[in-house]
Amino acid sequence: AVLDWELCHLGDPMEDLGWLCTCSWRFGNHAMPVGGFGQYDDLFAGYERASGRAVDPERVRFWVILGSLKWGVMCCGMADTFESGNDRTIERAMVGRRASENEIDLLRHLLAI
């Protein structure tokens, strides 16, 4: 397992599940909505078993959408950092160009409402 602390904060536990299910982490494997490797039902059942907390799929969906927006804003920030010359690494350019993926993902969510 990998523990990523850069966005650590107190909040709704459903946010963590939503972040894992954000489209950006599927890396093209859209048939597997959980990080590109699993299904919602399996994630929710495993989470409930391990935590003793009930999963609210609608709250997770909210966090999936907000996670996509949040990642899109971060991608735009990285693109700006690259374009301004403050960080000309290939990593900044590559992540920055992913902002458009989030725009498409958010439009798909809006169409599904």
Regions found by a protein language model. Give the residues of each.
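Short amphipathic alpha-helical segments and their helix-coil junctions
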Residues: 2-5, 38-56, 99-106, 110
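Active-site acidic catalytic loop and adjacent metal/ATP-binding pocket
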Residues: 1-15, 19
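All-alpha amphipathic helical-bundle segments outside canonical DNA-binding/catalytic cores
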Residues: 54-66
